[in-house]
Each structure stands twice: as C-alpha cells, then as structure tokens.
Amino acid sequence: MRLKNHSSVSEFLLLGFPIRPEQGGIFFSLFLAMYLITVLGNLLIILLIRLDSHLHTPMYFFLSHLAFTDISFSSVTVPKMLTKVQNQPIPITYEECVSQTYFFIFFADLDSFLITSMAYDRYMAICHPLHYITIMSQSRCAMLVAVSWVIASACALLHSLLLDQLSFCADHTVPHFFCDLGALLKLSCSDTSLNQLVIFTAGLAAIMLPFLCILISYGRIGFTILQVPTTKGICKALSTCGSHLSVVALYYGSIIGLYFLPPSNSKINNNIVASVMYTVVTPMLNPFIYSLRNKDMKGALKKLLSKKTEFSK
C-alpha cells in the first residue's frame, strides 16, 4: 500500500558509485564476493555457536546475534546495489526507499547496541569474575538483546515516519548507492529541522552514548589489569578483548568519521567510502576477526571439520 506522504515522487534514482561504465563489471564482482563472504562467514559463526556446547556462553550468545545482524545489515543495501551496479543510476520506488531507510537504521542501531552489550560482558568477566555467572545469566543476556531490538526498532520507526511526512522537489536523484537519510533530507522541499533534531538526538543515544559506554568499560578493564600487571593477565585480557576492540574500531571509526566529524571538500565521495566501510567491509571482516583471533572459535571449527571428515568416510 502506498505510504501517505505529501509528495508526488513515485521513485528515486540512486546515483551509485562514481565509476566509469567499463568498471561496472569489476565492482559487481568485488561486491558480490564481499557479500557472499559476509553471509557465509557470519552463518558459519552462528552454526559453530549453535553446535558447540563450549560456546554457549554470554559472549558467544551476543556474537551470534551480531553475526545475524551483520548479514541483515549488508542485505539491506548490497543486493539492490548489485542488480544495477553495471547500469547506474539505480531506480528505487518511494516505498522501497522508505523501507530501506527503516531497516538500514534499525540494523545499524542494533549493531551498536549489541557491540556495547559485548563490551559490558567483557567488563563483567574481567572486573567482576566472581559475580559474572550470576549477573550475566541467560535471562539477563536475553533481556539485553530484546531491549536492543525494541530501542533500535523504535528509533528506525521514528525516522521513517518523519521522513514520510516530507515533500520532495523535482530533483529526485540521490548521490548514494542506497537511500541514505541525510541525502534524502537534502532533496526535500519541506522544513527538515525536526528531522535533523531527531537525527542528532538519536545519533547521540544510539551511537555516541554506546561508544562512550564501551570506552568506559575498557577503561575499567585496563585499570583492573594494571593493578596486577602480570604477563599472563595481560595476554588473557588481550585474547578476550582483542577481537571485540578491532570490531569497535572498524564500526565506530567509520560511522563517527562519516556523521560526527566536519565535512571535507570531497564530501560525497568520502561519504560513499565510509558507508562502504561499515555496511560492507566491517560485516565481512567480523567473522575473520572473531575466528582467526579466538582459540574457542578455531577449536569449534576444527571439531566441525573433523566430524565432517569422519562422516564422509
């Protein structure tokens, strides 16, 4: 059913990437490979966590949800982009654009909340090990994930409803490869001050506040380690937190650089590069980060492969 907006615009044109037509095949192959790696890698993480009882812990519970979110996050933008990357611009209907905006914001915020929950889990494991099992109970972990879903859904719904109230000018070309909310607001003929206020407020609540909580958590972890600076303790902390810190740096580095730092002269191209980093590259790298630097994940993978070999015999 057609959304009730104040605009006669029936579709938008996504300009996609600033590339030459002959480069379309290369970009199609590249992004298709990255998307397949994202889906298969994160599905493997979910499978390993489900099958290996040693991974039925709070940290891996959050990781399985993060893997699902990463698959969904990339799936919001990449498949649509792949269908027309060799024949830009990319047409997208008004309804599809609003829906894409909703799910993009939803999974982006959910990613942020889940990464924060994982930092809280690491903080409790290192700073309060005696109370860890009691505090990080199965019900507590499920509650953290459920609250993350509810808040992310509410934020995305608010942005989408406000977007649907806007009128759009004759120019309906979006200088991006997906329906980016900021780019859409620039095309509007309506007053977008309320939208901008909500973006700023929600950005603080969904991105900057979780990032601050992560920094505080790791600050407390570092302080705890330095109180008893043994080589074994430092190595254990790095093993426990190293993978998560890498994900934090990739995800928040891209988003903060895109939305919270002063714009540069080549703002459009920089926006596209930063968006590719946190919508395509980061979800693709997460399985490698968590598997290559994690003994438990590597052990679970070896057991799965050994079982497969025995079954084939």
Swiss-Prot record:
| Subcellular location as annotated | Cell membrane
Keywords of this entry: Cell membrane, Disulfide bond, G-protein coupled receptor, Glycoprotein, Membrane, Olfaction, Receptor, Sensory transduction, Transducer, Transmembrane, Transmembrane helix
Against SUPFAM superfamilies, the record matches this protein to:
Family A G protein-coupled receptor-like
- The primary location reported for this protein is membrane
Q: What superkingdom heads the lineage? A: Eukaryota
For whether the record's keyword set contains Cell membrane, the answer is yes
Q: Which residues lie on this side of the membrane: Extracellular?
A: 1-25, 79-97, 164-196, 262-271
Q: Name one GO biological process term.
A: sensory perception of smell
Q: Which residues cross the membrane?
A: 26-46, 58-78, 98-118, 143-163, 197-217, 241-261, 272-292
Q: What family, per the record? A: Belongs to the G-protein coupled receptor 1 family.
This chain's protein is named Olfactory receptor 1J1
